């Protein structure tokens, strides 16, 4: 969970004014980061033709970083450097560092990315690997960490897990000839609620400790935006002899993480949401150092290491090209790599990470807490539970959520409200049957963005056709 220790921000009476929002922007120490991104224009987001960015001075309000982050300006520079390397020196790009390029030689690129990602997730550099995509990485990690026995075979997960997680777990159970109806345990909220309390999760762990082998939860629940207490849940589950994994798709680049200190067994994430690495970008995985050790006590040719699905790129670089078919894994998460990673994908990833390298998750989280609290304050301002046609289903506690607020609309409102928002140049995510997921992102969103969004959102709710 986040290390934010301050209480929930309190806003003055004039917080509903555009002038107040502008004053928050003027005092924002991260304001300059917005200029490191290409903000889509209002005209372009509603256009059906391919358009060049930067032709309009009227940017949209982009609150969809929880689905896909926007493009860093560095991306084009990094991609151009990668293409120039390929065109100018060909295969030598694997082994030669070029002066003037922001990128290392190709065989070191994944390590360059992993070193930066490790700071985002609170890990040692060797505990992180830049590779694959989220679901593929979850499959690799489950193959290594899920070790069912006749008595301990269950996997615990949340009741509304993203389908890829659900499918991955089902397939691993089937791989071991287990019935998901017997071996998959869904942890859900109380009837009529959306938040799953830590106490309820711990009670499920207690209830199934004798028969469960592993628990896999999201760091942040994608639908509700709830941030789980990763540290407490991890420690408790491990005390009951469960292996603990985390899907950090919505936590990476969003909240402070300390995976090493929290003793997490394994984790995986994508990088295209708050990470801004591009659609379908390369993902990352974490394996705690205690699981990534390679023991040579019985000789150089008899390494002992945690079982995993192996590939040549996970072999130690010093022997990778010896072709003797004696696998000696890279110590740490790098030993889970399979194939030569795409240098083009890594260029996009490294470009996005170059922005994070200029700040810290602590600073980003500080602004994020303020942005989301301001959004919540304006949404609830001058309304009551009885009068407002929506409910915020994300926890009110800043330490139990990330950037996102999930706004549940009354039945029948979602399509029209979503259409009105898009017509107004606002990009946010909708989830059936009635949720608008709004995610102000500290790297490129402003408090004025929040003010404008709420003004337009409430105006959309006041449209006559929505009141009938």
From Swiss-Prot:
Gene: bna5-2
Record InterPro entries: Aminotrans_V_dom (IPR000192), Kynureninase (IPR010111), PyrdxlP-dep_Trfase (IPR015424), PyrdxlP-dep_Trfase_major (IPR015421), PyrdxlP-dep_Trfase_small (IPR015422)
A GO molecular-function annotation: pyridoxal phosphate binding
Name under which the protein is recorded: Kynureninase 2
Entry-annotated residues carrying N6-(pyridoxal phosphate)lysine: 273
Gene3D superfamilies per record: Aspartate Aminotransferase, domain 1, Type I PLP-dependent aspartate aminotransferase-like (Major domain)
HAMAP family, alphabetized: Kynureninase
Assembly: Homodimer.
UniProt EC number: 3.7.1.3
Cellular component, GO annotation: cytoplasm
């Amino acid at each position: 969970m986040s290390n934010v220790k301050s209480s929930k921000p309190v806003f003055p009476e004039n917080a509903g004014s555009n002038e107040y929002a502008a004053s928050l922007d003027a005092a924002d120490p991260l304001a300059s980061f917005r200029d490191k991104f290409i903000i889509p224009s209002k005209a372009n987001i509603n256009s059906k033709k391919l358009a060049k960015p930067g032709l309009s001075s009227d940017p949209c309000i982009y609150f969809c970083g929880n689905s896909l982050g926007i493009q860093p300006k560095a991306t084009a520079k990094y991609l151009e450097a990668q293409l120039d390397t390929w065109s100018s020196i060909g295969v030598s790009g694997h082994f030669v560092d070029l002066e003037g390029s922001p990128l290392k030689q190709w065989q070191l690129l994944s390590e360059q990315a992993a070193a930066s990602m490790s700071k985002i997730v609170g890990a040692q550099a060797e505990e992180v690997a830049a590779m694959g995509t989220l679901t593929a990485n979850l499959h690799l990690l489950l193959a290594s960490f899920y070790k069912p026995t006749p008595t301990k075979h269950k996997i615990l997960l949340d009741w509304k897990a993203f389908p890829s997680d659900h499918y991955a777990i089902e397939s691993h159970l089937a791989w071991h000839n287990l019935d998901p109806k017997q071996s998959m345990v869904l942890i859900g909220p109380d009837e009529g609620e959306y938040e799953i309390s830590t106490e309820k999760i711990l009670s499920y762990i207690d209830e199934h400790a004798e028969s469960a082998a592993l628990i896999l939860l999201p760091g942040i629940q994608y639908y509700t935006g709830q941030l789980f207490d990763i540290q407490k849940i991890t420690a408790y589950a491990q005390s009951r002899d469960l292996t603990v994994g985390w899907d950090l798709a919505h936590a990476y680049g969003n909240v402070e993480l300390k995976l090493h200190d929290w003793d997490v067994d394994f984790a995986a994430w994508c990088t295209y949401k708050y990470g801004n690495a591009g659609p379908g970008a390369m993902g990352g995985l974490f394996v705690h150092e205690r699981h990534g050790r390679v023991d040579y006590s019985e000789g150089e040719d008899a390494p002992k290491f945690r079982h995993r699905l192996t590939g040549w790129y996970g072999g130690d670089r010093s022997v990778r090209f010896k072709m003797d078919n004696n696998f000696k894994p890279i110590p740490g998460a790098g030993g889970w790599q399979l194939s030569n990673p795409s240098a083009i994908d890594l260029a996009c990833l490294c470009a996005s990470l170059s922005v994070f390298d200029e700040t810290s998750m602590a600073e980003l989280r500080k602004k994020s807490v303020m942005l989301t609290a301001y959004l919540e304050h304006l949404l609830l301002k001058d309304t009551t539970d009885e009068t407002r046609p929506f409910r915020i289903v994300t926890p009110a506690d800043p330490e139990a959520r990330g950037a996102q607020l999930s706004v549940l609309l009354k039945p029948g409102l979602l399509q029209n409200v979503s259409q009105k928002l898009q017509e107004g140049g606002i990009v946010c995510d909708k989830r059936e049957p009635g949720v608008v997921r709004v995610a102000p992102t500290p790297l490129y969103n402003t408090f004025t963005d929040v003010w404008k969004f709420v003004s337009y959102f409430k105006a959309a709710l006041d449209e006559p056709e929505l009141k009938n």
